[in-house]
Amino acid sequence: MAPSNLPAIFNPSQQDIEMLLAAQCHLGAKNLQVHMEPYLWKTRPDGVNVINVGKTWEKIVLAARIIVAIDNPADICVISARPYGQRAVLKFAAHTGAVAIAGRFTPGNFTNYITRSFKEPRLIIVTDPRTDAQAIKEASYVNIPVIALCDGDSPTEYVDVAIPTNNKGRHAIGLVWWMLAREVLRLRGTLASREAEWDVMTDLYFYRDPEAEENKDSAGVEEAKVPGADEVGPAAVADGFTSEWEVSGASAGAFTSQAAAATTSWDAEPSTDWAATTGGEAATGEGWGAETTGAQPATQW
């Protein structure tokens, strides 16, 4: 790392440099813009340009001092059309009081006062000058300073402060926004001292895939589901399946009839013949043929 021109109090700690390297903030693109050449450390044999992380830290501190110079935090607009930076700008806005535009930038936000989303910020911060070109172009029309996270191949036209870093990796983008928010809070006095650790983890600024998180949650629910829980209900699951089955609505007569039925065999022969029973009914005149027999005429034809 090159010697820093900052005062001693602004020098990065060893942990800050290690975090920048771990998040691969130093890995730039293979293409190089001429205006980004001063931030280049060297070029690897595979063609990847390595960014000087010391310059990255200097520009983070410079950008934080510019942000703190604005009295009203709501006059600062942070923008990210790149999905990897949308979560980071929302968290940055929540911690510093800025206004976030995550997603598509509506043309005319800074120039067309008729639109409902018209804004007049005093400073804008963008994640990528290439994907956020519309915001930078409109800012140039109304004289709004621009701070941008710039890679080796990023256009720097109308960019006032370029923070050299890898603006294509999810970890690199999240870490730079996290460091920028922490430095702003330090300069504002929200953090007691520069030695005090910020209780917000860097993971909060990292991009998370919604589909992956949803699949992870559904997989966890399936693993935690107890077999047979749908049949017995949640109460039995909570009791650990220790409750006994309840028997209700059975009378004593039901058990008596069952006992009586058990004494006889189902394949036993009946005691009387059905034909004999029919004959008996006919003889007594109680059967269905009794009326026919009694209604016969006295004489036959």
Swiss-Prot record:
InterPro entries (UniProt xref): Ribosomal_uS2, Ribosomal_uS2_C, Ribosomal_uS2_CS, Ribosomal_uS2_euk, Ribosomal_uS2_euk/arc, Ribosomal_uS2_flav_dom_sf
GO CC annotation terms, alphabetical: cytosolic small ribosomal subunit
GO molecular function: structural constituent of ribosome
Stretches for region Disordered: 261-301
Ranges of Low complexity composition bias in the record: 274-295
Pfam families for the chain: 40S_SA_C (PF16122), Ribosomal_S2 (PF00318)
GO biological process: cytoplasmic translation; ribosomal small subunit assembly
Coiled-coil portions: none
Location within or outside the cell: Cytoplasm
Keywords annotated in UniProt: Cytoplasm, Ribonucleoprotein, Ribosomal protein
Role this protein plays: Required for the assembly and/or stability of the 40S ribosomal subunit. Required for the processing of the 20S rRNA-precursor to mature 18S rRNA in a late step of the maturation of 40S ribosomal subunits.
Subunit structure: Component of the small ribosomal subunit. Mature ribosomes consist of a small (40S) and a large (60S) subunit. The 40S subunit contains about 33 different proteins and 1 molecule of RNA (18S). The 60S subunit contains about 49 different proteins and 3 molecules of RNA (25S, 5.8S and 5S). Interacts with RPS21.
Family, as annotated: Belongs to the universal ribosomal protein uS2 family.
Classification via HAMAP family: Ribosomal_S2_euk
Protein name: Small ribosomal subunit protein uS2
Origin species: Phaeosphaeria nodorum (strain SN15 / ATCC MYA-4574 / FGSC 10173) (Glume blotch fungus)
Species classification: Eukaryota, Fungi, Dikarya, Ascomycota, Pezizomycotina
